[in-house]
Amino acid sequence: MNPGYDCLFKLLLIGDSGVGKSCLLLRFADDPYTESYISTIGVDFKIQTIELDGKTIKLQIWDTAGQERFWTITSSYYRGAHGFLVVYDVTDQESYANVKQWLQEIDRHASENVNKLLVGNKSDLTTKKVVDNTTAKEFADSLGIPFLETSAKNATNVEQAFMTMAAEIKKQMGPGAASGGERPNLKIDSTPVKPAGGGCC
């Protein structure tokens, strides 16, 4: 039976609590923005289907809790992930400094050579910005990973961040995705799915 998509990519949003991971996911998947902040407990996820280079790709995006007490829970979700969006808050120097720790968590728990994207969120707060774009870009370049500044509030680069991540994964996987099948429009499906597995059919 044709599942209606060519590839399934599992993505994880990681980073300190309060950097805006949930807002980025909601903006991308549902397109609302809320000023109210409720910390994620454990993990949450959404499904988003996109079109990329003529392929229908289902993104299973996991939003993880940034608090240290949840790290044991969330680290178990690292296995089988195809890509990580490592998020910090451009107005919070500590959240940027902790990026190295999050990258170590990826190295410890995820597959080797997994795709990563450094994301500086809350770029709309220009007067409160403390992490310079150039500094973050140079750090990302030194790791050989892409970097974007985003704003969940005004949607700047939000879609581009997830599309960049999907494109990087697809490029690393190379040709071989099955062609054909349905071509659904952008849609959200909150049906729970097994966290393991995925990849191109």
From Swiss-Prot:
Main location, first listed in the record: membrane
Cross-referenced InterPro entries: P-loop_NTPase (IPR027417), Rab (IPR050227), Small_GTP-bd (IPR005225), Small_GTPase (IPR001806)
Disordered as annotated region, ranges: 174-201
PTM text: (Microbial infection) Phosphocholinated at Ser-76 by L.pneumophila AnkX, leading to displace GDP dissociation inhibitors (GDI). Both GDP-bound and GTP-bound forms can be phosphocholinated. Dephosphocholinated by L.pneumophila Lem3, restoring accessibility to L.pneumophila GTPase effector LepB.
Motif Effector region, residue numbers: 37-45
Residues recorded as bearing (Microbial infection) O-(2-cholinephosphoryl)serine in the entry: 76
Lipid sites, type S-geranylgeranyl cysteine: 200-201
This enzyme's EC code(s): 3.6.5.2
Catalytic activity: GTP + H2O = GDP + phosphate + H(+)
GO CC annotation, single: membrane
Compartments it resides in: Membrane; Cytoplasm
Pfam family, one: Ras
Protein transport recorded as keyword: yes
Keyword field: Cytoplasm, Glycoprotein, GTP-binding, Hydrolase, Lipoprotein, Membrane, Nucleotide-binding, Phosphoprotein, Prenylation, Protein transport, Transport
Known role: Protein transport. Probably involved in vesicular traffic.
Name this protein carries in UniProt: Putative Ras-related protein Rab-1C
